[in-house]
Protein backbone atom coordinates (compact mmCIF):
# COMPACT_ATOMS: atom_id res chain seq x y z
CA UNK A 1 0.00 0.00 0.00
CA UNK A 2 2.84 2.42 0.84
CA UNK A 3 4.27 2.06 -2.65
CA UNK A 4 0.90 2.90 -4.20
CA UNK A 5 0.49 5.91 -1.91
CA UNK A 6 3.95 7.23 -2.82
CA UNK A 7 3.05 6.90 -6.52
CA UNK A 8 -0.12 8.92 -5.92
CA UNK A 9 1.79 11.62 -4.00
CA UNK A 10 4.42 11.91 -6.77
CA UNK A 11 1.69 12.21 -9.39
CA UNK A 12 -0.06 14.87 -7.30
CA UNK A 13 3.16 16.90 -6.96
CA UNK A 14 3.79 16.71 -10.73
CA UNK A 15 0.24 17.90 -11.45
CA UNK A 16 0.64 20.77 -8.95
CA UNK A 17 3.84 21.79 -10.76
CA UNK A 18 2.12 21.53 -14.15
CA UNK A 19 -0.71 23.79 -12.97
CA UNK A 20 1.78 26.56 -12.19
CA UNK A 21 3.08 26.46 -15.79
CA UNK A 22 1.90 29.69 -17.56
CA UNK A 23 1.20 27.72 -20.79
CA UNK A 24 -1.19 25.38 -18.97
CA UNK A 25 -2.71 28.26 -16.99
CA UNK A 26 -3.56 30.10 -20.22
CA UNK A 27 -5.19 27.00 -21.78
CA UNK A 28 -8.62 26.71 -20.15
CA UNK A 29 -9.27 23.06 -21.16
CA UNK A 30 -5.81 21.87 -20.08
CA UNK A 31 -6.07 23.77 -16.80
CA UNK A 32 -9.52 22.28 -16.06
CA UNK A 33 -8.28 18.76 -16.88
CA UNK A 34 -5.30 18.98 -14.50
CA UNK A 35 -7.39 20.72 -11.81
CA UNK A 36 -9.88 17.83 -11.88
CA UNK A 37 -7.05 15.29 -11.59
CA UNK A 38 -5.54 17.24 -8.69
CA UNK A 39 -8.91 17.42 -6.89
CA UNK A 40 -9.35 13.64 -7.26
CA UNK A 41 -5.93 12.90 -5.73
CA UNK A 42 -6.01 15.57 -3.01
CA UNK A 43 -7.98 13.61 -0.34
CA UNK A 44 -5.59 10.63 -0.69
CA UNK A 45 -2.47 12.81 -0.50
CA UNK A 46 -3.80 14.79 2.50
CA UNK A 47 -4.58 11.56 4.38
CA UNK A 48 -1.22 10.00 3.40
CA UNK A 49 0.68 13.04 4.72
CA UNK A 50 -1.27 12.78 7.97
CA UNK A 51 -0.29 9.09 8.11
CA UNK A 52 3.40 9.92 7.57
CA UNK A 53 3.22 12.47 10.43
CA UNK A 54 1.76 9.78 12.71
CA UNK A 55 4.57 7.34 11.77
CA UNK A 56 7.17 10.04 12.52
CA UNK A 57 5.54 10.83 15.89
CA UNK A 58 5.51 7.10 16.78
CA UNK A 59 9.23 6.91 15.95
CA UNK A 60 9.96 9.99 18.10
CA UNK A 61 7.91 8.65 21.03
CA UNK A 62 9.77 5.32 20.87
CA UNK A 63 13.10 7.21 20.91
CA UNK A 64 11.98 9.16 24.00
CA UNK A 65 11.07 5.92 25.81
CA UNK A 66 14.55 4.55 25.05
CA UNK A 67 16.20 7.78 26.33
CA UNK A 68 15.79 6.66 29.96
CA UNK A 69 14.39 9.97 31.34
CA UNK A 70 11.50 8.79 33.61
CA UNK A 71 9.34 11.95 33.14
CA UNK A 72 9.79 11.92 29.37
CA UNK A 73 9.23 8.17 29.28
CA UNK A 74 5.81 8.42 30.98
CA UNK A 75 4.66 11.20 28.63
CA UNK A 76 5.98 9.35 25.58
CA UNK A 77 4.25 6.10 26.58
CA UNK A 78 0.89 7.91 26.88
CA UNK A 79 1.41 9.57 23.50
CA UNK A 80 2.50 6.28 21.90
CA UNK A 81 -0.66 4.57 23.15
CA UNK A 82 -2.82 7.27 21.52
CA UNK A 83 -0.84 7.21 18.27
CA UNK A 84 -1.12 3.43 18.01
CA UNK A 85 -4.92 3.76 18.25
CA UNK A 86 -5.02 6.38 15.49
CA UNK A 87 -2.65 4.56 13.09
CA UNK A 88 -4.97 1.63 12.10
CA UNK A 89 -7.91 4.04 11.67
CA UNK A 90 -5.93 6.11 9.17
CA UNK A 91 -4.72 2.95 7.42
CA UNK A 92 -8.35 1.87 6.98
CA UNK A 93 -9.32 5.31 5.62
CA UNK A 94 -6.41 5.15 3.15
CA UNK A 95 -7.51 1.70 1.94
CA UNK A 96 -11.00 3.06 1.28
CA UNK A 97 -9.57 6.10 -0.55
CA UNK A 98 -7.50 3.77 -2.76
CA UNK A 99 -10.52 1.69 -3.82
CA UNK A 100 -11.11 1.98 -7.59
CA UNK A 101 -13.68 4.69 -8.29
CA UNK A 102 -16.95 3.66 -9.92
CA UNK A 103 -16.91 5.74 -13.14
CA UNK A 104 -20.71 6.02 -12.90
CA UNK A 105 -20.69 7.70 -9.47
CA UNK A 106 -20.82 11.28 -10.77
CA UNK A 107 -23.66 10.56 -13.21
CA UNK A 108 -27.20 11.83 -12.87
CA UNK A 109 -29.87 9.21 -12.18
CA UNK A 110 -32.83 7.75 -14.05
CA UNK A 111 -35.17 6.55 -11.30
CA UNK A 112 -37.88 4.04 -12.21
CA UNK A 113 -40.47 2.94 -9.64
CA UNK A 114 -43.15 0.38 -10.47
CA UNK A 115 -45.99 -0.99 -8.35
CA UNK A 116 -45.52 -4.72 -7.75
CA UNK A 117 -47.88 -7.17 -6.04
CA UNK A 118 -50.70 -5.61 -4.05
CA UNK A 119 -52.91 -3.71 -6.51
CA UNK A 120 -53.91 -0.19 -5.46
CA UNK A 121 -51.95 -0.49 -2.21
CA UNK A 122 -48.75 -1.26 -4.19
CA UNK A 123 -49.42 1.81 -6.37
CA UNK A 124 -49.80 3.98 -3.25
CA UNK A 125 -46.54 2.55 -1.90
CA UNK A 126 -44.80 3.39 -5.22
CA UNK A 127 -45.98 7.00 -4.68
CA UNK A 128 -44.60 6.93 -1.09
CA UNK A 129 -41.21 5.77 -2.39
CA UNK A 130 -41.13 8.44 -5.10
CA UNK A 131 -41.91 11.13 -2.52
CA UNK A 132 -39.17 9.73 -0.24
CA UNK A 133 -36.53 9.97 -3.00
CA UNK A 134 -37.79 13.39 -4.14
CA UNK A 135 -37.51 14.73 -0.56
CA UNK A 136 -34.04 13.21 -0.20
CA UNK A 137 -32.96 14.79 -3.50
CA UNK A 138 -34.33 18.15 -2.36
CA UNK A 139 -32.27 17.93 0.86
CA UNK A 140 -29.14 17.44 -1.30
CA UNK A 141 -29.98 20.33 -3.64
CA UNK A 142 -30.57 17.96 -6.57
CA UNK A 143 -33.15 18.54 -9.30
CA UNK A 144 -36.01 16.05 -9.86
CA UNK A 145 -37.87 15.96 -13.18
CA UNK A 146 -40.71 13.53 -13.94
CA UNK A 147 -40.32 11.92 -17.37
CA UNK A 148 -43.37 9.66 -17.40
CA UNK A 149 -46.00 8.54 -14.91
CA UNK A 150 -49.10 6.35 -14.81
CA UNK A 151 -51.15 7.65 -11.86
CA UNK A 152 -54.08 5.77 -10.32
CA UNK A 153 -57.36 7.19 -9.06
CA UNK A 154 -56.35 7.13 -5.37
CA UNK A 155 -53.09 9.05 -5.81
CA UNK A 156 -50.75 6.13 -6.40
CA UNK A 157 -48.58 5.28 -9.40
CA UNK A 158 -48.54 2.10 -11.47
CA UNK A 159 -45.22 3.44 -12.73
CA UNK A 160 -43.24 6.66 -12.41
CA UNK A 161 -39.95 7.53 -14.13
CA UNK A 162 -37.89 10.60 -13.27
CA UNK A 163 -34.41 12.06 -13.61
CA UNK A 164 -32.48 13.15 -10.52
CA UNK A 165 -29.65 15.54 -11.40
CA UNK A 166 -26.92 16.68 -9.05
CA UNK A 167 -23.40 16.05 -7.80
CA UNK A 168 -22.92 12.44 -6.71
CA UNK A 169 -26.57 11.44 -7.27
CA UNK A 170 -25.76 7.96 -8.61
CA UNK A 171 -23.08 7.29 -5.97
CA UNK A 172 -25.69 7.80 -3.23
CA UNK A 173 -28.71 6.13 -4.84
CA UNK A 174 -27.15 3.17 -6.68
CA UNK A 175 -27.86 0.69 -3.87
CA UNK A 176 -31.61 1.45 -3.91
CA UNK A 177 -32.33 -0.90 -6.85
CA UNK A 178 -34.43 -3.91 -5.96
CA UNK A 179 -37.75 -4.93 -4.44
CA UNK A 180 -39.08 -2.76 -1.59
CA UNK A 181 -41.82 -4.29 0.60
CA UNK A 182 -44.47 -2.52 2.70
CA UNK A 183 -46.53 -4.01 5.53
CA UNK A 184 -49.53 -1.91 6.65
CA UNK A 185 -53.32 -1.70 6.85
CA UNK A 186 -54.44 -0.31 3.47
CA UNK A 187 -56.83 2.67 3.37
CA UNK A 188 -59.15 0.47 1.31
CA UNK A 189 -59.20 -2.33 3.96
CA UNK A 190 -62.38 -2.36 6.06
CA UNK A 191 -61.42 -5.26 8.35
CA UNK A 192 -58.14 -3.67 9.51
CA UNK A 193 -55.92 -6.55 8.37
CA UNK A 194 -52.23 -5.90 7.61
CA UNK A 195 -51.38 -6.39 3.93
CA UNK A 196 -47.98 -6.90 2.31
CA UNK A 197 -47.33 -5.12 -1.00
CA UNK A 198 -44.23 -4.45 -3.06
CA UNK A 199 -42.75 -1.95 -5.49
CA UNK A 200 -39.62 -2.32 -7.60
CA UNK A 201 -37.03 0.43 -7.82
CA UNK A 202 -34.44 0.69 -10.59
CA UNK A 203 -31.65 3.27 -10.38
CA UNK A 204 -29.79 3.74 -13.66
CA UNK A 205 -26.92 6.14 -14.43
CA UNK A 206 -27.95 8.68 -17.05
CA UNK A 207 -26.07 7.87 -20.25
CA UNK A 208 -24.56 10.57 -22.44
CA UNK A 209 -24.73 10.30 -26.22
CA UNK A 210 -21.00 9.54 -26.20
CA UNK A 211 -21.59 6.60 -23.81
CA UNK A 212 -23.90 4.74 -26.16
CA UNK A 213 -24.60 5.11 -29.87
CA UNK A 214 -28.19 4.63 -31.06
CA UNK A 215 -28.89 4.23 -34.77
CA UNK A 216 -32.00 6.20 -35.78
CA UNK A 217 -32.88 3.29 -38.13
CA UNK A 218 -33.35 1.10 -35.04
CA UNK A 219 -36.09 3.36 -33.66
CA UNK A 220 -39.83 3.49 -34.24
CA UNK A 221 -41.26 6.76 -32.94
CA UNK A 222 -45.00 7.22 -32.37
CA UNK A 223 -46.79 10.33 -31.17
CA UNK A 224 -50.13 10.46 -29.35
CA UNK A 225 -52.28 12.71 -27.15
CA UNK A 226 -51.13 12.74 -23.53
CA UNK A 227 -53.57 11.32 -20.98
CA UNK A 228 -54.35 11.77 -17.30
CA UNK A 229 -55.51 9.32 -14.59
CA UNK A 230 -58.00 6.77 -15.92
CA UNK A 231 -56.76 7.28 -19.49
CA UNK A 232 -58.75 10.42 -20.34
CA UNK A 233 -57.08 12.68 -22.91
CA UNK A 234 -55.78 15.90 -21.35
CA UNK A 235 -54.13 17.37 -24.43
CA UNK A 236 -55.51 17.51 -27.95
CA UNK A 237 -52.06 18.03 -29.50
CA UNK A 238 -49.95 14.97 -30.34
CA UNK A 239 -47.19 15.96 -27.90
CA UNK A 240 -46.66 12.58 -26.14
CA UNK A 241 -43.90 10.39 -27.58
CA UNK A 242 -43.42 6.63 -27.54
CA UNK A 243 -40.08 5.21 -28.77
CA UNK A 244 -39.55 1.54 -29.59
CA UNK A 245 -35.95 0.31 -29.86
CA UNK A 246 -36.49 -2.44 -32.45
CA UNK A 247 -33.37 -4.63 -31.78
CA UNK A 248 -34.12 -4.99 -28.03
CA UNK A 249 -37.88 -4.37 -27.95
CA UNK A 250 -37.42 -1.69 -25.25
CA UNK A 251 -40.36 0.75 -25.19
CA UNK A 252 -40.09 4.17 -23.53
CA UNK A 253 -42.57 7.00 -23.52
CA UNK A 254 -42.84 10.52 -22.20
CA UNK A 255 -45.92 12.73 -22.00
CA UNK A 256 -44.91 15.06 -19.19
CA UNK A 257 -44.01 18.09 -21.34
CA UNK A 258 -46.31 20.08 -23.63
CA UNK A 259 -43.64 20.05 -26.33
CA UNK A 260 -43.15 16.94 -28.48
CA UNK A 261 -39.43 17.79 -28.89
CA UNK A 262 -38.88 17.92 -25.10
CA UNK A 263 -40.81 14.67 -24.61
CA UNK A 264 -38.65 13.01 -27.27
CA UNK A 265 -35.43 14.26 -25.57
CA UNK A 266 -36.57 12.90 -22.20
CA UNK A 267 -37.64 9.54 -23.67
CA UNK A 268 -34.24 9.23 -25.39
CA UNK A 269 -32.52 9.83 -22.01
CA UNK A 270 -34.37 6.85 -20.54
CA UNK A 271 -33.66 4.68 -23.60
CA UNK A 272 -29.92 5.47 -23.46
CA UNK A 273 -29.80 4.64 -19.74
CA UNK A 274 -31.58 1.31 -20.25
CA UNK A 275 -29.37 0.30 -23.18
CA UNK A 276 -26.25 1.21 -21.19
CA UNK A 277 -27.54 -0.94 -18.31
CA UNK A 278 -28.05 -3.89 -20.71
CA UNK A 279 -24.45 -3.47 -21.91
CA UNK A 280 -23.22 -3.33 -18.34
CA UNK A 281 -25.15 -6.44 -17.33
CA UNK A 282 -23.82 -8.28 -20.39
CA UNK A 283 -20.24 -7.47 -19.39
CA UNK A 284 -21.05 -8.41 -15.81
CA UNK A 285 -22.36 -11.81 -16.88
CA UNK A 286 -19.10 -12.40 -18.77
CA UNK A 287 -17.25 -11.76 -15.51
CA UNK A 288 -19.31 -14.18 -13.41
CA UNK A 289 -16.60 -14.32 -10.76
CA UNK A 290 -17.06 -10.62 -10.09
CA UNK A 291 -20.83 -10.82 -9.72
CA UNK A 292 -20.55 -11.36 -5.97
CA UNK A 293 -18.87 -8.01 -5.66
CA UNK A 294 -21.57 -6.21 -7.63
CA UNK A 295 -24.35 -4.93 -5.42
CA UNK A 296 -27.78 -3.47 -5.98
CA UNK A 297 -27.55 -4.28 -9.67
CA UNK A 298 -31.29 -4.03 -10.13
CA UNK A 299 -32.11 -7.73 -9.74
CA UNK A 300 -35.88 -7.32 -9.46
CA UNK A 301 -36.34 -10.57 -7.50
CA UNK A 302 -34.08 -9.33 -4.71
CA UNK A 303 -36.12 -8.07 -1.71
CA UNK A 304 -33.89 -5.42 -0.24
CA UNK A 305 -35.97 -3.51 2.31
CA UNK A 306 -39.15 -3.76 4.38
CA UNK A 307 -41.21 -0.79 5.62
CA UNK A 308 -43.43 -1.99 8.49
CA UNK A 309 -46.02 0.63 9.52
CA UNK A 310 -47.50 -1.03 12.67
CA UNK A 311 -43.98 -1.35 14.14
CA UNK A 312 -42.72 2.04 12.81
CA UNK A 313 -39.82 -0.04 11.44
CA UNK A 314 -37.55 -0.01 8.37
CA UNK A 315 -35.25 -3.00 7.83
CA UNK A 316 -32.59 -3.26 5.13
CA UNK A 317 -32.18 -7.01 4.67
CA UNK A 318 -28.79 -6.81 2.91
CA UNK A 319 -26.97 -5.38 5.90
CA UNK A 320 -29.35 -6.28 8.74
CA UNK A 321 -29.96 -2.60 9.59
CA UNK A 322 -33.22 -1.85 11.45
CA UNK A 323 -34.43 1.67 12.29
CA UNK A 324 -37.56 2.54 14.25
CA UNK A 325 -38.22 5.86 12.51
CA UNK A 326 -40.39 5.00 9.53
CA UNK A 327 -42.01 8.43 9.23
CA UNK A 328 -38.65 10.23 9.06
CA UNK A 329 -37.38 7.73 6.47
CA UNK A 330 -40.44 8.20 4.23
CA UNK A 331 -39.92 11.97 4.57
CA UNK A 332 -36.56 11.56 2.84
CA UNK A 333 -34.26 11.19 5.88
CA UNK A 334 -32.42 8.19 4.42
CA UNK A 335 -28.79 9.28 4.93
CA UNK A 336 -28.35 6.81 7.79
CA UNK A 337 -29.38 3.89 5.53
CA UNK A 338 -27.42 5.10 2.50
CA UNK A 339 -24.22 5.78 4.48
CA UNK A 340 -24.45 2.33 6.13
CA UNK A 341 -24.85 0.67 2.70
CA UNK A 342 -21.88 2.59 1.25
CA UNK A 343 -19.69 1.59 4.24
CA UNK A 344 -20.80 -2.05 3.99
CA UNK A 345 -20.03 -2.36 0.29
CA UNK A 346 -16.71 -0.54 0.68
CA UNK A 347 -15.76 -3.13 3.32
CA UNK A 348 -16.82 -5.95 0.96
CA UNK A 349 -14.60 -4.52 -1.79
CA UNK A 350 -11.68 -4.19 0.65
CA UNK A 351 -11.93 -7.94 1.35
CA UNK A 352 -11.42 -8.58 -2.37
CA UNK A 353 -8.31 -6.38 -2.62
Swiss-Prot record:
GO cellular component, one term: cytoplasm
Post-translational modification: Methylated by PrmC. Methylation increases the termination efficiency of RF1.
Keyword vocabulary terms for this entry: Cytoplasm, Methylation, Protein biosynthesis
Coiled coil (UniProt feature): none
One MF term in the entry's GO annotations: translation release factor activity, codon specific
Compartment(s) where it occurs, according to its Swiss-Prot or TrEMBL record: Cytoplasm
Keyword Protein biosynthesis among record annotations: yes
PANTHER family listed in its UniProt record: LD18447P
NCBIfam families: prfA, PRK00591.1
Function: Peptide chain release factor 1 directs the termination of translation in response to the peptide chain termination codons UAG and UAA.
Family statement drawn from the similarity comment of this UniProt entry: Belongs to the prokaryotic/mitochondrial release factor family.
Protein name: Peptide chain release factor 1
Species name: Thermodesulfovibrio yellowstonii (strain ATCC 51303 / DSM 11347 / YP87)
Amino acid sequence: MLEKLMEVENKYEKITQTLSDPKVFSNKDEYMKYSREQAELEPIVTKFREYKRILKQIEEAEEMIKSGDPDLKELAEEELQQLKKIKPQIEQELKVLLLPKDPRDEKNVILEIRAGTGGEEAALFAANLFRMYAKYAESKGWKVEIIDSHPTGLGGFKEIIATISGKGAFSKLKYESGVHRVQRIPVTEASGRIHTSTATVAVLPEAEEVDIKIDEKDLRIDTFCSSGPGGQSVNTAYSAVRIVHIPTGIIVQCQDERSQIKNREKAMKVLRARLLEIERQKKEAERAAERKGQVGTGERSERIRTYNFPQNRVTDHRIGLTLYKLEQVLNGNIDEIIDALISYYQAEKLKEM
